[in-house]
Amino acid sequence: MNNPFMQNMQQEEDRYLTDVHPLAKLWALRILVELGGAKEFINDNCFSHQWIAKHLGFSEALLGEQFNSQIAYQELAQLHQMAEIVQVQNPAQFSAELSYNLKLLQRLLGLNEVECLILGFVVLVHSEQLLDDIADHLGTLTAAKSMKALAIILAVPYEDVRQALAVQGCLHRSGLIHLQREYSSYL
């Protein structure tokens, strides 16, 4: 039985997610492929979040009645590979507004490029539902694992991320980002 309320909610969600930021999509694919988030995302019989699969670009066959987890993993690998190729050929950037604000903060606080990238990532996690939901597939992470995950997601050296998130770093001192080292948390 079709529930009109659920259909309206799905239509609203589809409308809201029609324009997923290219960086959010790339980073979501890295989480799924390079960090193992796919184990939670691709189940034996379906995707854990059908709407995410749709917006990442999975085929209609997998989104419908013909789901096959093996084919889903193959498509995921292809989607990830294509996103990486596109990123090399035509690098995605933050929106003009976010770029402007990051540049202002960079000048005011003396942030380096990696610190700006981490801050931009945090903004996208909080503003892009797709990226936020995919990041949850990593489960709880210690501070060290969070830094390793960020290095992989952002494709920057681990040591640069560690320095950017250090207690003596600009992000921590400014209060913009505080990585709690005492316990595990979601990314």
Task: Please give the residue ranges for each predicted region.
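Intrinsically disordered, low-complexity N-terminal extensions of AAA+/P-loop NTPases
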Residues: M1-L187
